[in-house]
């Protein structure tokens, strides 16, 4: 006999069963040493958002705080947390995909937050479709796409950020379609937030391509946010009358732009002024918005058969005085979003390019082309119709091509499924296929970058196997997230390397044979071919580091040492010379991961510390003689003393360029001067030289991190500007008088001889090169001003 359960009991039982199944799944996965993707239950193609959502779901169910009676809860959760830490980080994910866990030995992690953090603080906006969580690699492309963005920079532990979250969600729904609403987690993307000048949370900024970011400082209510946003929306609502009607309509129709017109009679419903403004912003560049006061423009309304309040969309060429015409769209809604969506759906599709004229059309203009097979899949996202307008200033035309009408053409382009591609005005020879998100802002960024870049899509017919010119070739797979992240950086690099080497991409899912020929075992693999020389790139996914890699191939920053040169250059070094040496083996995964960081570090230490490397596979007996017992072994050889063989071994956990440089600089004599209140007053405030001062506190972590950077700065500006340090814990009154409110703080003091006075300025950067460039710029400006003042006298 069956037992009937009521609804609540049934739901509780289902939840219990679901939890049991989830726990069982994780136990099986953890116990069988599955890979990180399996641990989180995501595919290798998962986006950052999907990874966060999967981890949060597991964290809330399996956190040790929720499972106090499970002795294995801590260990099991560490494995899941470790998987998340690696897969959320683009560089670590690339290392893991290429080397597995062996490539992560320098990044052990091992810490996690409380259950309440994952429940209330983690991924605040991941479940809100109207809010786009932006990451560093996509931020600039998004805000420079041409659309208007309002971005919330927040920190997970910030109470004010959580107070704002419900309002931000309501606001996002209110303005959906009018502008893009974004969010940046400064806990995950600290570098991005620092680059954008975010010093407090939440910080709200408006972004649009071509204009400086505008910070919002007003009340955090939905109404105030909407009012502020509307100030930056491009809106033009035209009041139509007998005097301007014909000219306004004909001018727009001639440009291929239709009109949305609301006819208003007193006492009847028509679109409010606020709704008209919103629609004008939402339809900017697509449709003009106007209104007619039929009480004062009676004859105009009668000529258009408008006898009651109504709203209609008139496409270009529509007959206005015949409302029976099927081309006119009458709208019954008074809601801006509903009207917007209905009009967007009714806008014409992109031009269908014919097979016999395709080559000619692509040879004379730059095009963004949607390829489809039979059914046009773009109709599912009507917002893409904005592309034509948003790309107009870039002189990019937008069209579509049906591959079922000419399969041979698509086959020659290696197009075997629906996609979109940019053609650069040279027919079908120069093109690039889009592998990113099929959403408006991502496509816009791709199109703008691609037409101006010099990236060639490679295949068997144009692969530079025997080309005399140097090539940088990226072997990739479209499903691979790190590959997709690298592509925009390659475009940036290609413009800066134009004329020096060529840049191409090869899709290994299509050209498997070519990739196998070059023994490509992981994606992305980026290789420089220079005739017989082949060099694999191992650095971060940034244009800057790609350029550094190319420069290092031309002018190596690391000396490759042999036993003979090691003896001559290191052991017999001059008295004032110092060396840092990396003993490595080519087969060692941590060594491979270290090498690009080692080269990067070497470039920043030019003129200060000599940097070398020894291949212990090639010189095994020599390394044994030098007592090298592990790889990589990093040693610092200080200024020569009576003990020529003295060295210091690096035992730090982090082997990135910044950490290694800080370690090496720590052995050099201090270049800056420690100042007391008396010497600060005498030498800086009353002295006759230029100074840059680091105000710090010994207990301050950022101060400790900045200390070696300041020492590097002191050496870079030696002879031009003196560098000093003031301990604000020991001398608080000196720092208070100097206006210091945070540590570390850097201030520049320039002495003006004519006035015998000191000019001072706060410096916000923490990068030695940036500060040095800023100081030299200020000196040049300062000296020019002094010269002008003399000339005037």
Swiss-Prot record:
Residues 1-32 form the signal peptide. Pfam families: DnaJ (PF00226), Thioredoxin (PF00085). This is DnaJ homolog subfamily C member 10. PROSITE patterns: DNAJ_2, ER_TARGET, THIOREDOXIN_1, THIOREDOXIN_2. GO terms for biological process: ERAD pathway; intrinsic apoptotic signaling pathway in response to endoplasmic reticulum stress; IRE1-mediated unfolded protein response; protein folding in endoplasmic reticulum; response to endoplasmic reticulum stress. Glycans are attached at residue 530. Its EC number is 1.8.4.-. Endoplasmic reticulum disulfide reductase involved both in the correct folding of proteins and degradation of misfolded proteins. Required for efficient folding of proteins in the endoplasmic reticulum by catalyzing the removal of non-native disulfide bonds formed during the folding of proteins, such as LDLR. Also involved in endoplasmic reticulum-associated degradation (ERAD) by reducing incorrect disulfide bonds in misfolded glycoproteins recognized by EDEM1. Disulfide bonds join 158-161, 480-483, 588-591, 700-703. It comes from the Eukaryota. Keywords: Disulfide bond, Endoplasmic reticulum, Glycoprotein, Oxidoreductase, Redox-active center, Repeat, Signal. Residues 348-463 are annotated as: Trxb 2. InterPro entries: DnaJ_domain (IPR001623), ER_disulfide_reductase (IPR052460), ERdj5 (IPR021170), ERdj5_TRX_C (IPR035674), ERdj5_TRX_N (IPR035673), J_dom_sf (IPR036869), Thioredoxin-like_sf (IPR036249), Thioredoxin_CS (IPR017937). One of its GO terms (cellular component) is endoplasmic reticulum chaperone complex. CDD domains: DnaJ (cd06257), PDI_a_ERdj5_C (cd03004), PDI_a_ERdj5_N (cd03003). A motif (Prevents secretion from ER) lies at residues 790-793. Residues 130-232, 454-553, 557-665, 671-776 form the Thioredoxin domain. It is found in: Endoplasmic reticulum lumen. Residues 235-350 are annotated as: Trxb 1. Interacts with HSPA5 (via its J domain). Interacts with EDEM1. PANTHER family: DNAJ HOMOLOG SUBFAMILY C MEMBER 10.
């Amino acid at each position: 006999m069956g037992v009937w359960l009521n609804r609540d009991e049934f739901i509780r039982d289902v939840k219990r069963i679901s939890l049991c199944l989830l726990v069982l799944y994780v136990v099986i996965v953890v116990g069988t040493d599955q890979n990180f993707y399996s641990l989180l239950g995501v595919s290798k193609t998962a986006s950052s958002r999907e990874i966060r959502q999967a981890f949060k779901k597991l964290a809330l169910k399996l956190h040790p705080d929720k499972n106090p009676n499970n002795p294995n809860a801590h260990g099991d959760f560490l494995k899941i947390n470790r998987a998340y830490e690696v897969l959320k980080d683009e560089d670590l994910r690339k290392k893991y995909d290429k080397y597995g866990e062996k490539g992560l030995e320098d990044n052990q992690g091992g810490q996690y937050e409380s259950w309440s953090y994952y429940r209330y603080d983690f991924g605040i906006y991941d479940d809100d479709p109207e809010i786009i969580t932006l990451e560093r690699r996509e931020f600039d492309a998004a805000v420079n796409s041409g659309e208007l963005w309002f971005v919330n920079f927040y920190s997970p532990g910030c109470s004010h950020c959580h107070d704002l979250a419900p309002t931000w969600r309501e606001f996002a729904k209110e303005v959906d379609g009018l502008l893009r609403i974004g969010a940046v987690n400064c806990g995950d993307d600290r570098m991005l937030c620092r680059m954008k000048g975010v010093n407090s949370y939440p910080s709200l900024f408006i972004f649009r391509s071509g204009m400086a970011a505008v910070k919002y400082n007003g009340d955090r209510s939905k109404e105030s946010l909407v009012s502020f946003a509307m100030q930056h929306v491009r809106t033009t609502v035209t009041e139509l009358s007998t005097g301007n009607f014909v000219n306004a309509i004909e001018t727009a129709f001639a440009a291929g732009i239709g009109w949305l017109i609301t006819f208003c009679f007193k006492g009847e419903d028509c679109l409010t002024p606020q709704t008209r403004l919103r629609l004008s912003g939402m339809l900017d560049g697509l449709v003009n918005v106007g209104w007619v006061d039929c009480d004062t423009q009676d004859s105009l309304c009668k000529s258009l058969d408008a006898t009651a309040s109504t709203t209609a969309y008139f496409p270009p060429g529509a007959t206005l005085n015949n409302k029976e015409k099927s081309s006119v769209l009458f709208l019954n809604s008074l809601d801006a979003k509903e009207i917007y969506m209905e009009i967007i759906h009714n806008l014409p599709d992109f031009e269908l390019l014919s097979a016999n004229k395709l080559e000619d059309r692509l040879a004379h203009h730059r095009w963004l082309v949607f390829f489809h097979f039979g059914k046009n899949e773009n109709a599912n996202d009507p917002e893409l119709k904005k592309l034509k307008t948003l790309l107009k200033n870039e002189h990019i035309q937008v069209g579509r091509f049906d591959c079922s009408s000419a399969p041979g053409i698509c086959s020659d382009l290696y197009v075997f499924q629906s996609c979109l591609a940019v053609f650069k005005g040279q027919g079908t020879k120069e093109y690039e296929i889009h592998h990113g998100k099929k959403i408006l802002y991502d496509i816009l960024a791709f199109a703008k970058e691609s037409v101006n870049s010099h990236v060639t899509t490679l295949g068997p017919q144009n692969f530079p196997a025997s080309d005399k010119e140097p090539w940088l070739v990226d072997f990739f797979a479209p499903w691979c997230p790190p590959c997709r992240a690298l592509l925009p950086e390659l475009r940036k690099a290609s413009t800066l390397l134009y004329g020096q080497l060529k840049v191409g991409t090869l899709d290994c899912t299509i050209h498997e044979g070519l990739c196998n020929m070059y023994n490509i075992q992981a994606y992305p693999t980026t290789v420089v071919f220079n005739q017989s020389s082949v060099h694999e790139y191992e650095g971060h996914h940034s244009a800057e580091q790609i350029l550094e890699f190319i420069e290092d191939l031309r002018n190596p920053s690391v000396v490759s040492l042999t036993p003979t040169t090691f003896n001559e250059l290191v052991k017999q070094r001059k008295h004032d010379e110092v060396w840092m040496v990396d003993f490595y083996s080519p087969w060692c995964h941590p060594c491979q991961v270290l090498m690009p960081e080692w080269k990067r570090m070497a470039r920043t230490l030019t003129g200060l510390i000599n940097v070398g490397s020894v291949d212990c596979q090639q010189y095994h007996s020599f390394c044994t003689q030098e007592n090298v017992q592990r790889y990589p072994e990093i040693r610092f050889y200080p200024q020569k003393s009576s003990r020529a063989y003295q060295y210091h071994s690096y035992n730090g956990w982090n082997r990135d360029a910044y950490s290694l440089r800080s370690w090496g600089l720590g052995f050099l004599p201090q270049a800056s001067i420690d100042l007391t209140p008396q010497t600060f007053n005498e030498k800086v405030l009353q002295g006759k030289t230029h100074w840059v001062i680091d105000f710090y506190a010994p207990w301050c972590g950022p101060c400790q991190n900045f200390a070696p950077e300041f020492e590097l700065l002191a050496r870079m500006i030696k002879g031009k500007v003196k560098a000093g340090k003031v301990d604000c814990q020991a001398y608080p009154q000196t720092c208070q008088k100097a206006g210091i409110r945070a540590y570390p703080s850097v201030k520049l003091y320039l002495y003006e001889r004519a006035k015998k006075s000191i000019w001072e300025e706060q410096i916000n950067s923490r990068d030695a090169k940036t500060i040095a460039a800023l100081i030299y710029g200020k000196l040049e400006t300062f000296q020019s001003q002094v010269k002008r003042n003399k000339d005037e006298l």
